[in-house]
Amino acid sequence: MIEPIMSPYLTFDRQHWAQLRNSVPMTLSESDLKELQGINDHLSMTEAVEIYLPLARLLNLYVAARQSRNGVLHQFLGNTESAPPFVIGIAGSVAVGKSTTARLLKALLSRWENHPKVELITTDGFLYPNKVLTERGIMHKKGFPESYDIRRLVEFVSEVKAGQPNVTAPVYSHLTYDITDEMKVVDRPDVLIIEGLNVLQSGMDYPHDPHRVFISDFLDFSIYVDADSQLIEKWYIERFMKFRQGAFKKPGSYFSHYTALTEAQAEQKARSIWETINGKNLVENILPTKGRAHLILRKGLNHTVEEVLLRK
């Protein structure tokens, strides 16, 4: 373990972090991992065992501690209502691997007996519909804070946190690049994972609006998936090129016109999108929230985690 002077984090290299697994068994198979990983992620069994099992163990301990505290409070108050869910936020750039991290943690955490019901929600579902974004002239800023229906997202998390049954969340389609008519129902989970670009934004980002409420106000634990911006740009372009050969060709795909581009044109387009939208959003809105996370997963080449930072 490396502990930089004056750092609010404990820093672990891969070897030392892996030792914190503490003999927790791996309950997922190679085929399970293949289903969980994103199109451009490289999730190996070694990565799952050495990085994500220790993290799942840590989260299990946090959840157990919260459940114990809730039990004491309920006993004191004579309250028989079910405890609120433990809410985990996962933030980071586009193409850094947030979704794979979220899906893997959901699968691992649901194996523990004291919190078997784990739900995963992405903030994509709370983007404004394309029609609204177009009317407001911010279609080019999709993914930026102003493109989200924050009020609706906060209401959703608040209702789930309050223990309300059958809370609904809108569903986003990456195929049509828009909100669908489908709704996801979340019914009193033990753990709720919220994955999205800006889940760690707080009042520090909006000092002029002291009464604004944020998703970060409801988080019990937060994770930031980090990597060098040049690496993320490389991953984004690689993912774009793979989508061009697959998802972009599907009927109804919003991005079908990109399939007509040559290889060089497609790569140039992906780089342009990164520089004008995703890279800009990372620098302006996402990266500044990294230091608020309870835990940071620092990735290197091939999407493998090289370092873990845990807040003291």
Curated annotation (Swiss-Prot):
The keyword Phosphoprotein does not apply. GO terms for cellular component: cytoplasm. It is found in: Cytoplasm. Signal peptide: none annotated. Its EC number is 2.7.1.33. GO terms for molecular function: ATP binding; pantothenate kinase activity. This is Pantothenate kinase. It holds the Pfam family PRK. One of its GO terms (biological process) is coenzyme A biosynthetic process. NCBIfam families: panK_bact. Pathway: Cofactor biosynthesis; coenzyme A biosynthesis; CoA from (R)-pantothenate: step 1/5. Belongs to the prokaryotic pantothenate kinase family. The keyword Glycoprotein does not apply. The lineage of its organism: Bacteria, Pseudomonadati, Pseudomonadota, Gammaproteobacteria, Vibrionales.
